[in-house]
């Protein structure tokens, strides 16, 4: 404002917009002492919290391709789901998601699953035992830049081999593309 780059009117408009949003969200009169660990533990994981998580997640997903109406998976009693992440740090989230889906009745109670990650040392043969047991396969493709699309790059090669295996063996498979959309 002092240098004239932004007018005082423009600054006031921005402040008004921010304050209006804060008022709408109920954070103008934020009282940190009202936020306790007990209240947080009560809210996180609650039905309301879980419903909101699902709505946000559903709004964030874009289905690019759905051949043969594979999605959503129709997991039946006794089915086995294999989830393969590109990195070890993805496995806890995959496990949590499956446990929640089973606990919430979205998947049958006797659905079994394995969540693990593949690495650049992984081969189709090293994953074969898990692939053979699976009725449904979810593999994460995590491509961060265009150069990783090379067919021999492990984060491209392994998901491709897994999907080819699933197609050959009549198993339902989905690729979950995260990171940048180069692999889409």
Feature map (PLM): residue ranges:
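Preference for extracellular/luminal or secreted protein segments
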Residues: 1-184
């Amino acid at each position: 404002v002092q240098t004239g780059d932004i007018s005082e009117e423009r600054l006031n408009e921005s402040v008004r917009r921010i304050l209006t949003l804060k008022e709408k969200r109920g954070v103008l009169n934020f009282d940190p002492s009202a936020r306790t660990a007990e209240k947080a533990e009560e809210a996180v994981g609650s039905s309301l919290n879980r419903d909101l998580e699902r709505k946000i997640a559903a709004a964030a997903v874009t289905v690019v391709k759905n051949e043969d109406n594979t999605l959503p998976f129709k997991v039946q009693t006794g089915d086995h789901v294999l989830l393969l992440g590109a990195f070890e740090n993805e496995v806890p989230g995959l496990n949590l998601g499956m446990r929640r889906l089973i606990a919430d009745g979205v998947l049958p109670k006797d659905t079994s699953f394995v969540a693990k990650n593949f690495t650049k040392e992984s081969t189709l043969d090293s994953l074969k035992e898990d692939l053979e047991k699976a009725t449904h396969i979810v593999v994460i493709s995590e491509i961060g830049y265009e150069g990783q699309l090379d067919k021999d790059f492990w984060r491209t090669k392994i998901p491709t081999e897994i999907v080819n295996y699933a197609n050959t063996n009549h198993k339902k498979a989905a690729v979950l593309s995260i990171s940048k959309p180069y692999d889409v």
